[in-house]
């Protein structure tokens, strides 16, 4: 796909890759964590603030939510990157990229994926209440997203993990963004959590209204008395393709 660049030529409009969790890489490089079997742990891939106090507050908030949901906090990892490959525009807004590993307790498969979804939605709400910015790229026991305000050539150079032969996946879905109706940013790079999509959805407002009209009934069918915790389904501050991803994620987990 065509990829846009900023005025400094080294700042891309965003690029990334969606893969299966690199289980072997984690087991062999994250030595301070004792991993359960594959499928029994999930990973939150996150953009967090560079300011340490804000970052620590967000991390403690997430840990509290995980424990409230009855799951285990296995540990944290700072994703190794090479910031020197970035353009000046990307460097100015570069976040700290962290991974939180979550152990499943008495659940697996789709039930665990739904619990990770509930944890993320609670974390998003509490972060907003705290007035702290964060972004969860992916929150799953099955897949993970590596992305940033980079070009396709920079993606592998920036993330050390992507150059490691122990990073193994049965698939890799790659996207390079050409920003049109929204300004480039780290979180707006693709892939989204589930989909790669070029946007330009002509029926966007009609789709949003249709989802608003049926989301409560849909949520109650799957989440019962916890439906309120996943509403609204769409983050209307995002791009059209990210809202499509919101809808797809919800329907997939339902």
Report residues per predicted region.
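Conserved short alpha-helical segments that host acidic/polar catalytic motifs at enzyme active sites
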Residues: 1-254
